[in-house]
């Protein structure tokens, strides 16, 4: 059939005009139309937040299909598996719509084919695609197609550590042993182990793996900075310019301060103050030295300049005016600290080069040996697979040409988050002029995953400067947010983001613009709010504030506004989302919202199970039972709702003895033998008596019963399970408690017994700052959402609260003794031996850690990259809101304004200040104060602690107190009493006819075993229950060093393999290998199948050989059904299952079954499966009326294959 031709620029212009003049309610923008139809060259679409980039991508793909391009001729890379699934769903919907409107049968047929082809088309992550290439063409590198992915970090660490240890030993005894020891000590200091050095090696290795060719990067770039920056003349010009800029900025800021009336006050004699004159002199010197730098100093005089600056400016960072401190000199101090000692640094820096060459050799050797170990294991990391794929395409022109010819277009979503490995893959798949890239550098927030926004930026600039290389299309219309959100976002980033910090100039071409008239409507009440807790830090006595990312007081501030929105503006809770920077340590928010009755659901893998209040109470209860001398746990138990001791009660108990453990004090109080027994009131005595009796009962019970039974006894004795059911989020709380009992049960089933071991396991999890997975329950529909900013990317919410904007950015990487740069290589802190600089009798040994020049340059590059990423993170967070945006932090109302009053530079905050600021709040307040004469579209509101009382905050659904000791109160409803009576009667009937009630019509062998284990000893296949039960995954953490294989998955794969082997008179190893490739199982599962044993079975065993001889009588994977009678109730039921295989001969049947169970003694398995094989034999007898059945087990789980004949 003939398809429509692709459009030229004139055709596209016509469509743009028609769209503009149409009466569509939602019109496509000219830029969207251009992005959909442009053809014949590379296209980069810079799509701002909410601009419809997914819409554009789907429409472009659909247009390709309608013009005759098959779906399998498109390569479409997405950032996540989820994004790929959503893209496929949208495509299916659009194709179905096109099918309905298609006029020709040929087109309908073609579109139907594309609809079918979506699931097998190359639409997915780059990881998935590179695996596909290596599976198919890995043989060119000697890589087996049956490899598995090393996803378990423990397994990776075991292999890495073994390789490292062997290599470390070789270097310690090699020809450069003395230098190597010096290298190790440079990073490990006086530590006796080499752990710090090992971490540096792993850091370099991981960084190199993010490049498109790790070995080449290590050989050509790793030492580049160390070999280049060896003297003053090598210092980059931009570093000098940056220093001079900081000097001028400092002078300008100081001049602004001297102009303040408060500062210019004269002394009593009418002359300027000493400080005033001193600061005027500093201004004069900084301006003079910066303007005449080349004449006065030049690069060789940088050390002298740094010393001159040090001599004239104060040693501290701040200048105080009218009681307010201004950090005027902070940035300047930071910039000159390394320059002051450059002469000394250059003197010793050369010594470090040989050590770095040694480190280079070590990492290269480590990389190669680690790779060889993985090849031996046939298990690889994702980065290995990606590099194999690149190597395959680079070294095999025919394979590369195959893909380049195949793909009409190479498309990529979220291009700003590409790394260099992915970029190289896209280059190899493209023919040079058929790439389509969609992204937004302002939303590049995955640097921790080695994403490099400069890849996008380089394309952006190249296409902007030279359109022949590719077409740049900018989508800036936002179809998500109201004008209040767009205006505030623009007002912040117009003054904040440029190429220095943020990696792109936020000019008019990037400013967000409302895409529809509806969004342009003004809603003054929805103006963006910066809500700040008014505090001088010392005002808050939040002992918990360091424990959480957001303090309880800030959480109250948020709760108050949410309750106001809900009650006064009728905003549903589900329309509100809280965004945080981290997915951990948000307990303060959870607890505060619980307190005020605000429903809250967390998203994105929040793991706070062990930190939930109800679980913490139970863990402390178990700790106390295990060891009553654990004061912390015991006091927590007494204070908990289970026993309700208050502070006064605990104080009276505590003073019964000064030195004893608290449990002994409780016993003294119980027997009234303490130092102050007169303080034990009758009411308190009754409480203690009840506690002691209950507690001792629990301790006695724990000695002879399982953990599961103990936990449920605690729940029932103190009605604790019922108690949490009366609290907010009752379903979640009860599910957590239920999960604790099941997890304890699973723990004991693993072979570990006892309360002490269980507690140690839990404590180990907590010590490692880990947690157990949260229990999933049916989440409330109308609840506030809590998620990380990263998780929110691509989503939209009506009301957004960005929390904890006063939290400092993490700069931990900048303090590392080793900093890496993709372009300049390594920079280190070098520990120099400077004892020759001083007289030996004064200091016999002097070692100084100095920041080498490459380190200083890399440090500044890393700092700017970190600040740029944080700025983009703030942009992502602010652009999630549809209606209203809140930003929440804390600051001092009396001090903040002057602190952030800066001098604008090119309509931006000064670069020096932007580099100094380390919180979102710093940026927001500085913009607000510096540009206060402009309309900024966001307000700053301070809230005092006095406004955050319970009375001011309010409550959503206040709950009544629950008394666990009052059984009448807990069962107060007559209806409940009657219901319980009826249920008890029903339960009696249920117990009487339990067997018949629980018996389903159809059973499998394993279910028969479950109910009638005393009668039969069998084990079979799948379990079918008649009553559907909610099943929750209560997995305990795996502390083993290697990933365990799922026995069920392995068993299923072996059975499928045995079914797929093409049977003949002579089964060969090639037949088994071929069948294995067809098995539908994970690569790791297939790799675990020991096909050598299967080959041995066919080649060496009598049964295996006989099966091959009688292949025409062979039946495999044969289903059966058989009627049985329940011996207890007389009810009839059907047993159903699948027999692995049997030979149907003239007068007998040979029945065999494969087992992958681990075993030492085969007789154990013979006994275990006696019942199952008997059932299978009975079914075959009834089916064929043949009495003689020979039964065999083929055991694959031992060191050697065993064939066991059953009785």
Swiss-Prot record:
It catalyses: Couples ATP hydrolysis with the unwinding of duplex DNA by translocating in the 3'-5' direction; ATP + H2O = ADP + phosphate + H(+). GO terms for biological process: double-strand break repair via homologous recombination. Its cofactor is Mg(2+). Keywords: ATP-binding, DNA damage, DNA repair, DNA-binding, Exonuclease, Helicase, Hydrolase, Isomerase, Nuclease, Nucleotide-binding. Transmembrane segments: none annotated. The keyword DNA damage applies. It comes from the Bacteria. Heterodimer of AddA and AddB/RexB. PANTHER family: ATP-DEPENDENT HELICASE_NUCLEASE SUBUNIT A, UVRD / RECB / PCRA DNA HELICASE FAMILY MEMBER. The heterodimer acts as both an ATP-dependent DNA helicase and an ATP-dependent, dual-direction single-stranded exonuclease. Recognizes the chi site generating a DNA molecule suitable for the initiation of homologous recombination. The AddA nuclease domain is required for chi fragment generation; this subunit has the helicase and 3' -> 5' nuclease activities. Belongs to the helicase family. AddA subfamily. This is ATP-dependent helicase/nuclease subunit A. The gene is addA.
